[in-house]
């Protein structure tokens, strides 16, 4: 049996994604998938996510990020894959305007 690849996904979501429950949508799905990391609103109106876990679960979350909740309009999701760090033990919503990890 092949071991599951662990990874880190950094994603920036652009569109009508603030004030529509997008961060709560992300935390709900990330928690259900057993992922760790955080999500935050950005000053320019987008949403940033830094998430760690198994590559298949992260790819599933990425598909969900592209869909968003019914009230959102997702125009673009920029993604960057990084090595897994194991830095977080849970998933959280960070305050608006947070930058860095």
Task: Kindly label every feature range from the protein language model.
Residues 1-101:
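Intrinsically disordered, low-complexity, mixed-charge
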């Amino acid at each position: 049996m092949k071991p599951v690849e662990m990874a880190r996904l950094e994603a920036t979501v652009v569109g009508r994604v603030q004030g529509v429950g997008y961060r709560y949508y992300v935390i709900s799905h990330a928690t259900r998938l057993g992922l760790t990391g955080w999500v935050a609103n950005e000053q320019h109106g987008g949403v940033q996510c830094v998430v760690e876990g198994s590559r298949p679960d992260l790819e599933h979350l990425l598909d969900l990020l592209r869909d968003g909740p019914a009230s959102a309009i997702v125009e673009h999701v920029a993604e960057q894959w990084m090595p897994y760090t194991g830095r977080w033990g849970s998933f959280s919503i960070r305050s608006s305007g947070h930058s860095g990890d």
